[in-house]
Amino acid sequence: MTIVCDTVEKKNEHIISYFENHKINYQHRKLREGDYCFMIPKNEELGFSTDYYFTDELSIERKSGLGEIAGNIKDETFHYELKRTQNKAHKFLLIEQIGGWHDIITAKYQNNYNPKSFYGALHTFEIKYGLHICFLPKEEMGLMIWTICKSVLNQYILHESV
């Protein structure tokens, strides 16, 4: 398995460092949606007759904090990107913010977006787009991305043919 990082993903040195320190294969490639997914190089034993990119099955969007996502909520481009992910089986929004929902309600973010509106908007995204929203420390982001990709791969190998 090789993690695919979008070429426009910024400030992800901590994630790349995690991959390198744990000898996780990765490559940079333009992704239409999301910041991360994965690919499987050709492997006849696993049933992959060619390189296979899981871009139709998985989208992982990463935000560097609540301030960034609060700014994106009002951006039509962000809404359009979420809409394009609707048919993917697995969609994740990973936010580097330990306090999560509590930090939203208590307005612990760098944006003047109303906390109740912010809280409601994220829950609307969860329901409308089937999005899994996870809050985690920056230091755990690489592990989370790898774990999600590995879990999706296991599901497809064990339960479905690509």
Each language-model region and where it sits:
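Non-catalytic C-terminal interaction segments of nucleic acid-processing enzymes
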Residues: 1-55, 67-162
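Conserved catalytic cores of phosphodiester-cleaving nucleases, focusing on short active-site segments
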Residues: 58-64
